Amino acid sequence: MVKRHKRRKFSGRVCEQIVYTVAGGTDPKTSRPKKPRFQTREEQDEFNRKISEGKLEALVNANFGPTSLYSTLTLDAENEVHTAAEMRQIRNRFYRRLLYKYPNAKIVIVYGQGKSTSRFHLHMISDGIPEDEIGRIWGLGSVVEIRHLREHNYYADADGNKIDHGRDYKALADYLHAHWRKEFGGHRYKASRSCIRPEPEPATEAVREYSPKHPPVAPRGYILVEARTTKYGYQYYKYVVDPRSEHKRNGSRLN
């Protein structure tokens, strides 16, 4: 007899919950969604890419917020490099210099290559490093963009309406994740050890019948912003801390 389990993962102010089918007698503490069967290598690669993408989304959401900085750093003509291996060395040296000066800083850093210029550059999200220090420690070119992460991030729902997800930085994380190319080799991103790595809670048995039209109840203080059944056979739900409650709290401080 098959059963359904549900499992939540909290990443900062975002909660993701999946509901999936398991064989009867499966221990909820160790259960996982059944891995799908793939017809082609491309399908498997796409599945693995989505898993990797989701991990970076959770990492960014768990560690960064409006006090954090997003920066883009470029190389000047004197320091320009032409291979991914050279750029990876530059990234690693910069990363080590940042942590030498700010050992408790949280950092996620990627390198990419411009589509039109083919020039390498870095993107970084950081917390605990002063804005003026980023350019000083970089020292190999320009900081062409540096800004704080947004308090409110809007995403289109199934009907095209823009919904406030608050501190859900999925779009930024996906943008960084997409910079990696297979020919680069190595890992898609580098994250400091100080970053929290979110892990899902142990699963529990789903005693009710759920569907995107009848989702699990949101955790207290959260609202449902996404509900769907995936092509891999499990249900996916996303909840965020209600951004309206943030408006109320921020407003009360001003009174």
Language model segments and positions:
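Right-hand nucleic-acid polymerase module
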Residues: 1-118, 128-255
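Calcium-binding loop positions in Ca2+-binding modules
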Residues: 121
